[in-house]
């Protein structure tokens, strides 16, 4: 079976840095054998992070900034690929492909007036291809959207390859900046794989931490442990329109970013900062549980919930999730419990998607994104001859 060595590159909505997974993949399709060789996260320097944050702001962004940042990030992504190869003592010349998600600048999954559904990820693939002398596959979301999908979530295809079990029905819950869930029926089942965003992950928690505590995030949920849940704030959060929508659906910074947090802090400024952080942590947990109870558990018998992403390291958030699901008779694990990496999960996913595109295989899941059909994802950029 043909073997490919691929670097999956992911820069998510949390802006933690650039995640890079060096992966060995044997074959293609659902029978692929995937092995993680090495994973690293390369932090953004403060200047780049500041420019990304400015580019994400409708009020402060401009086309000149986005144009320049597109090339700067391409260089950052190329350097991150070189770094993962260096750490793994792996020759860059051996690398067959790079799958680059890019940095999402704006994602509009549904029509809004005269604005049609669209998405924009930057991090120029030509720069990556030139700097690494390696073929790059990028812009994975656009073809799904061209086919009528929301362009998200895209990880379900990789999750079926990695996590489908002969007898257990599993929920894969990713808690990154945004939270998304994939329902993976067992190998004997004729039920569909479904997936959708459940709302905020770390996004609101991190933004509140930065504004109220001058910290990038709540490490291990230690601050949230000290406060109490304020029902008035929780009710306000849980009334968000996104929670009332039916899947397939996706969301992002546009709904749960700076604007949401500014309004929340203005409205509830009389409450202690610890209580506010505890409550928005509970909001993330409750929004996940809400979607399970409304859209999944009435239709699927779930044996295991497997948590991944940076939020799985927040023990307060995980405990809130356990309490919310204590009556549902399903075991809850984090990725590390079953031999995988919570941090590397999405970067591995884009290595797998790059492999599928290389083999001309469709790799969106229409039941997850709402696309009219399965499509081959991504644009291919070749290195200089």
Curated annotation (Swiss-Prot):
Gene that specifies this protein: anmK
Matches recorded under HAMAP family: AnhMurNAc_kinase
Catalytic reaction list: 1,6-anhydro-N-acetyl-beta-muramate + ATP + H2O = N-acetyl-D-muramate 6-phosphate + ADP + H(+)
Class of enzymatic activity (EC top level): transferase
Organism: Bacillus thuringiensis (strain Al Hakam)
Annotated metabolic or biological route of this protein: Amino-sugar metabolism; 1,6-anhydro-N-acetylmuramate degradation; Cell wall biogenesis; peptidoglycan recycling
Pfam annotation, one family: AnmK
Function description: Catalyzes the specific phosphorylation of 1,6-anhydro-N-acetylmuramic acid (anhMurNAc) with the simultaneous cleavage of the 1,6-anhydro ring, generating MurNAc-6-P. Is required for the utilization of anhMurNAc either imported from the medium or derived from its own cell wall murein, and thus plays a role in cell wall recycling.
Name of the protein described by the UniProt record: Anhydro-N-acetylmuramic acid kinase
Domain of life of the native organism: Bacteria
Alphabetized GO MF terms: ATP binding; kinase activity; phosphotransferase activity, alcohol group as acceptor
Protein family according to the UniProt entry: Belongs to the anhydro-N-acetylmuramic acid kinase family.
EC number in record: 2.7.1.170
SUPFAM superfamilies associated with the record: Actin-like ATPase domain (SSF53067)
GO biological process: 1,6-anhydro-N-acetyl-beta-muramic acid catabolic process; amino sugar metabolic process; peptidoglycan turnover
InterPro entries with a match to the protein in the record: Anhydro_N_Ac-Mur_kinase, ATPase_NBD
Binding-site positions, ATP: 12-19
Keyword field: ATP-binding, Carbohydrate metabolism, Kinase, Nucleotide-binding, Transferase
